[in-house]
Amino acid sequence: MNKLAQLDHKYVWHPFTQMRDWLKREPIVIAEGKGAELRDVRGRKFLDANSSIWTNLHGHNHPKINSAIQRQLKKIAHSSALGLANEPASLLAEKLATVANGKLKKVFFSDDGSTALEAALKLACEFSRRTTKIKNPKFISLEGAYHGDTVGAVSLGHIDLFHKAYGGLLFKTDKVMSPYCYRCPFNRAKPERDDARNYRKCNWECVGKVEQKISVQKKKGNPYAAFVFEPLMQGAAGMIPQPKGWLNRVAKIARGCGALLIADEVMTGFGRTGKLFACHHENVQPDFLCVAKGMTGGYLPIAATLTTQKIFDAFLGEYHEFKTFFHGHSYTGNQLGAAASNAS
């Protein structure tokens, strides 16, 4: 076993990994990458088939992104966004607001997908309190949802393998049926058959379940503060696609019942579904758009939560009113990450 592998075994604790098994074998130690190819310290080549967990868009060692980071590094690597602005982050915010289309004109930067979702969750919660006077706003997300690993994001998740162990830390959220055409529960589709919608006329029973759940909550006088979803494709649940038309229908239902829309495009954003954002396929305009992963082309950790002027305005006020959004991170709006994102 080479020296680097020995150091890894001795000191490193890997994510989502049963370390008992990990320590039984020599790990693959990556030394460099080019395009879709990774090379380890022994010179062996590997295909980066999952794009380094859905982060890499243009290939490793892309000259344009390399140059952008190098140019920025000669100026400054990082300065705080707390009380200071910077050029790359300002330019990136403008680009994001432009390509997102619609009313998403305000950008809150953070570090990764979980923190982007966390910011949206806090903003939606406080916005709901201020506009409805409901003290404990409720949230709803889809069965099989995965939105990250911080406490708020885990509270919105519904995959027991990842989330059950932390039950005592979490706040309660509701879940609702997500569509699964391949194994549609309403027509007893057999696993070996094709998409259920191809051989039986669909009556959108899955949409009816969403409508029932959300409308019942509204009738209780405590409508959901927000409906949180992964648009078009649920990732960690098993790469489960949503049928055409489902997202548009449930978005209208949720909005009609007073819920804000939080679109988690951490995985689907930046062209993964054929359009820049998955919501664009169904003309869905969320109140919050959470992006990360591919934003830098897979280079550096930076994320963003896009929202509307209406949400932004709810946090404006005098200091004694305590309307400030008290949330942030040390590396919010980091110049190197923003420079990589602008190039990407």
For each feature predicted by the language model, list its residue ranges:
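Conserved N-terminal phosphate-binding loop of PLP-dependent enzymes in the Aspartate aminotransferase
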Residues: 1-344
